A protein has these predicted regions:
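Bacterial C-terminal helix-turn-helix
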Residues: 3-6, 10-68
Length: 68
């Protein structure tokens, strides 16, 4: 996994993708994966992600996931 991450980071730097954009995309994909794994259940997804349900809900809205 470390090698894949290093390769991805190098590619993003070469493409001049800024840290804010990279972090935003990572967070969005991470949340979407947790929601998919839990069948869209935000309470379960929040537990999987280790965040409070309200925090997850705010991020779902922020990233326009699940129809928001």
């Amino acid at each position: 996994m470390k090698e894949k991450l290093e390769s991805l980071v190098t590619e993003m730097i070469d493409r001049r993708i800024y840290l804010d954009e990279a972090l935003n995309e990572f967070e969005k994909k991470f949340i979407q994966s947790a929601l998919t794994k839990t069948g869209g259940n935000q309470t379960k997804a929040a537990k999987v992600l280790g965040v409070h349900r309200n925090t997850l809900n705010r991020k779902v809205i922020q990233h326009k996931l699940n129809g928001h």
